[in-house]
A protein has these predicted regions:
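Short helix-coil boundary/hinge micro-motifs
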Residues: 1-148, 155
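BZIP DNA-binding basic region
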Residues: 129-185, 189-192
Length: 192
């Protein structure tokens, strides 16, 4: 069964890019769109995050994977309703500090529009865009709704649109049913 084909609800704005980025590692099906430099370059270019389809370096690939792991850990804390682990926060902060974005103002329809632009191309630029998206999500209050599936075999990121903000599964039809059925069978075996 391929439960991760249904990623659930899309996150708002650039947080959706962050969700898709973390989900480049499909733990359930054993696929990784950041498996190597070529695959990572293709994924980032396809998402419009990599300037000029510029290939990334081995160090850049490691940094992208570290960012992905930190964001997945932070989203798991959202799922559990726990404080974010310091190690993940520090890893995120370190990567964001090394790969910064700058504020750019443009005239738009007689007014001014602001945007964040990465200072560099390649993996560093992609990290800057992703870090800026997380920053924006924290400011707008949408960050706490980005969660990691509670199925340890999946951990797919999803956007929790429930009123109570207590969703735990990327898909109730998939992971929710799988985990609940597993728990039921375990209880039956134990006789409780």
């Amino acid at each position: 069964m391929n439960v991760t084909d249904d990623p659930g609800n899309a996150a708002p704005g650039m947080l959706e890019l962050v969700r898709r980025f973390v989900d480049t590692e499909d733990l359930y099906n054993g696929r990784d769109a950041l498996a190597d430099i070529e695959a990572a370059t293709a994924w980032l270019a396809g998402e419009g995050v990599l300037s000029n389809d510029r290939p990334i370096t081995a160090g850049g690939l490691d940094a992208l994977r570290n960012l992905r792991g930190a964001v997945r850990t932070l989203a798991a804390a959202n799922t559990a309703g726990e404080e974010a682990p310091r190690e993940a926060v520090e890893a995120f902060n370190d990567l964001a500090a090394r790969h910064a974005a700058v504020v750019r103002l443009d005239v738009l329809h007689g007014g001014v529009a602001a945007s964040l632009r990465p200072r560099e191309d390649g993996a560093g630029g992609a990290i800057a865009v992703l870090a800026a998206a997380v920053h924006q999500a924290v400011l707008t209050g949408t960050w706490t709704r980005l969660k990691s599936c509670a199925n340890p075999e999946c951990r797919w990121l999803f956007y929790d649109e429930s009123r109570s903000r207590t969703a735990r599964w990327c898909s109730m039809r998939g992971c929710g049913n799988i985990v609940k059925a597993r728990r039921y069978r375990e209880k039956q075996r134990r006789g409780t």
